[in-house]
């Protein structure tokens, strides 16, 4: 079900699902993420968001995806808030994310939530924007 969603959602944003390479972690989400949520409309996944632990004080926002038909309804904001609240309640001090400069809507959402641009913190060769949110101040 998740893989079907990703096969539909990723191409909407110009990405391709690579389960044997950069997206292999989707085959073992419980090992890779500390939290992973799916948003449903009836029995269909329409959005996802996840949190990955970087260390005891830092986590990373991952896999914030929403089918295009569901954009503009506040659902992306709800998914983001779910992850941020989880990060706060789990005791993380900072939440990082990486993205693409072409993902204008996503970047606007992140900035509205309080994320600011930071230095590159990982080796993701597919990302060109790196952001951080101070969770201690986001409450």
Which role does the model predict for each range below?
Residues 73, 77, 81:
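Residues forming the Rossmann-fold NAD(P)(H) cofactor-binding site
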């Amino acid at each position: 079900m998740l893989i079907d969603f990703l096969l539909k959602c990723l191409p909407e944003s110009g990405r391709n699902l690579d389960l044997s390479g950069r997206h292999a972690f989707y085959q073992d989400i419980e090992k890779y993420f500390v939290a992973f949520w799916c948003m449903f409309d009836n029995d269909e996944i329409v959005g996802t968001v996840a949190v990955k632990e970087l260390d005891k004080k830092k986590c990373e926002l991952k896999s914030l995806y929403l089918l295009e038909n569901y954009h503009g309804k506040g659902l992306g904001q709800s998914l983001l808030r779910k992850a941020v609240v989880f990060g706060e309640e789990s005791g993380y001090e900072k939440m990082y994310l990486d993205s693409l400069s072409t993902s204008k809507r996503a970047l606007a959402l992140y900035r509205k939530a309080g994320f600011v641009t930071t230095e590159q913190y990982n080796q993701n060769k597919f990302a060109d924007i790196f952001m951080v949110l101070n969770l201690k101040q986001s409450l």
